[in-house]
């Protein structure tokens, strides 16, 4: 009528928050189980008159919890929660002690759950006689993150995560301080080395976390087989164990993500610091190029001014020499003109005296002689005029030679 696969018992969630064996062999524990009972039949209902859950470790009883009575209808599911906590005396032998130490190292404990049940099956309006099956679940429960005796528990992960955040904040403050110009270069180098060392340590920690997750997920839950009609029915805990391991893995992945976020923030801060330094250096180089361009432009103007000053200086020196030469030439021309005028005056005075003397001579003088004398005088006067004309032309040529350099100098000075 009722087969073992018609009613399914499943531990879909388990949380072991405390599991510590003291030196006096007292085992302190705290375990919570979430159970689901599924009636897959559409024609029967089940009355549960007794339901008790008992936990065992190394075949030694830890504690038992009675569950409330209930009726499970057709194609229906009942969810139950059982809490086991307290302490009990546990005597472990040599091999069992070694297994406990192995469980303590890995953080995963092999715990058995026994369900003692009395139920009656109702078909239509008929109720059968009581049945007393026993259901056993073989569990491998990892010690919950955050437990007091967990070697790789959540408290340590949270502490490490907080240390990562604090270190990232300190590195961020150090990077902001390094932006100042008054900070020594040695301090900047030390802060950069510290950031690299922190990044390497964080990568090692993340690698260790991944290894821990792989070890925890490597445990394969026990898949029990049995008959519901026999005295003991072992129901596997494959799905619940997978869900539990997945939950623990997700929690650890969240911590890993937090650490990666902190690491990425530190990387971003370091990159921003490097970008700001590069921007500052680029701006300084641009300012240097601007100053250099202005200097080059001004240098061309200065060279033009120097060249013009040199040309003006040479032109002024040349003009000065021409002026001195013209002054000397003008002085000599004036003295020459004065001398010529004086000689002309003397000649004219001599001719006048001679004419007076000739006019006053004796009229009985020989006419032939007087004619010859007059001819001589005319010839002499003609020579004098020719000489005067030659001297006048020579003086004009010299004046032209003197006036040409003076005009060039004046034009150059006027242009400048």
UniProtKB/Swiss-Prot annotation:
**Keyword check for Coiled coil:** yes
Q: Where is this region: Disordered?
A: 375-401
One annotated Gene Ontology cellular component of this protein? membrane
- The record's disulfide annotation reads none
Gene Ontology BP, a term: protein transport
Q: Where is the signal peptide?
A: none
Residue spans of biased composition, Basic and acidic residues class: 390-401
Q: Which UniProt keywords apply?
A: Coiled coil, Protein transport, Transport
Q: Does the UniProt entry include the keyword Protein transport?
A: yes
Q: Which residues form the t-SNARE coiled-coil homology domain?
A: 265-326
Check the record and name the SMART domains matching this protein: t_SNARE
Coiled-coil annotated residue ranges, if any: 374-404
* Family affiliation: Belongs to the syntaxin family.
Summary of the function given for this chain in its UniProt record: Vesicle trafficking protein that functions in the secretory pathway.
Protein name, please? Putative syntaxin-24
Q: What is the lineage of its organism?
A: Eukaryota, Viridiplantae, Streptophyta, Embryophyta, Tracheophyta
Q: Which gene encodes it?
A: SYP24
């Amino acid at each position: 009528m009722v087969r073992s696969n018609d009613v399914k018992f499943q531990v879909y969630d388990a949380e072991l928050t405390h599991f510590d064996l003291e030196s006096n062999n007292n085992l302190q524990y705290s375990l919570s189980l979430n159970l689901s009972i599924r009636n897959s039949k559409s024609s029967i209902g089940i009355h549960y008159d007794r339901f008790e859950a008992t936990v065992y470790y190394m075949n030694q009883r830890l504690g038992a919890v009675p569950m409330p009575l209930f009726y499970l209808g057709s194609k229906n599911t009942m969810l139950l929660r059982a809490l086991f906590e307290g302490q009990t005396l546990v005597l472990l032998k040599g091999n069992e002690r070694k297994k406990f130490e192995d469980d303590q190292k890995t953080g995963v404990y092999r715990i058995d759950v026994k369900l003692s049940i009395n139920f009656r099956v109702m078909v239509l309006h008929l109720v059968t006689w009581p049945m007393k099956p026993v259901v056993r679940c073989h569990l491998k429960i990892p010690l919950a993150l955050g437990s007091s005796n967990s070697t790789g528990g959540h408290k340590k992960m949270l502490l490490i995560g907080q240390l990562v955040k604090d270190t990232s904040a300190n590195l961020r403050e150090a990077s902001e301080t390094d932006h100042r110009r008054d900070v020594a270069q040695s301090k900047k180098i030390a802060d950069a080395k510290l950031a690299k060392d922190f990044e390497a340590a964080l990568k090692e920690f993340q690698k260790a976390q991944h290894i821990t997750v792989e070890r925890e997920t490597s445990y394969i839950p026990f898949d029990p087989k049995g008959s519901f009609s026999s005295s003991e029915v072992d129901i596997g805990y494959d799905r619940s164990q997978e869900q539990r391991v997945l939950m623990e893995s997700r929690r650890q992945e969240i911590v890993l993500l937090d650490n990666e976020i902190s690491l990425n923030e530190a990387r971003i801060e370091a990159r921003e610091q490097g970008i700001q330094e590069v921007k500052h250096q680029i701006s300084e180089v641009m300012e240097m190029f601007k100053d250099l361009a202005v200097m080059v432009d001004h240098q061309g103007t200065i060279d033009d001014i120097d060249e013009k000053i040199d040309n003006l200086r040479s032109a002024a020196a040349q003009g000065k020499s021409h002026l001195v030469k013209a002054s000397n030439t003008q002085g000599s021309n004036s003295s020459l003109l004065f001398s010529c005028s004086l000689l002309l005056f003397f000649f004219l005075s001599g001719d006048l005296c001679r004419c007076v003397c000739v006019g006053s001579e004796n009229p009985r003088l020989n006419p032939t002689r007087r004619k010859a004398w007059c001819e001589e005088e005319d010839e002499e006067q003609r020579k004098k005029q020719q000489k005067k004309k030659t001297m006048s032309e020579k003086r004009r040529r010299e004046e032209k030679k003197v006036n040409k350099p003076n005009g060039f100098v004046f034009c150059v000075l006027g242009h400048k």
